[in-house]
Amino acid sequence: MEWTAKKIRELIAEDKLYRFYKSTEWKALRDKILKENHYECEWCRDRGKISKAETVHHVQYVKNHPDLAMSEFYWFKGKRYRNLIALCHD
């Protein structure tokens, strides 16, 4: 399935966004981000601590930016930023 902004908005309206997070496409992208970061929490690593990353966070919230749900990066004022970051549960 291709996850379009329209489809994501429909899931949000139906209170079924969990379907996106259970999709094969999201799980593959999530696993890619975790692997690229060696399963380390980026937030903790930036503070000198090593913690196991267990989830991937959207910097640009899916409910606010459904068009970026599957985007690793986003642009703001001409600069590229990471949209998906590996995090622990702490």
What do the predicted segments below correspond to?
Residues 1-28, 45-52:
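A boundary/linker detector
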Residues 1-3, 36-40, 66-68:
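Short amphipathic alpha-helical surface micro-motifs
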Residues 19-22, 58, 75, 82:
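Compositionally biased, intrinsically disordered low-complexity regions enriched in proline and serine
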Residues 20-21, 33-36, 63-67:
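A short linear-motif detector with a strong N-terminal bias
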Residues 26-32, 72-77:
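Short, intrinsically disordered, charge-biased short linear motifs at domain edges
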Residues 27-60, 88-90:
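Short cysteine-rich loop/turn motifs with clustered Cys
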Residues 41, 65-90:
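Short beta-strand-alpha-helix junction that forms the catalytic/metal-binding core
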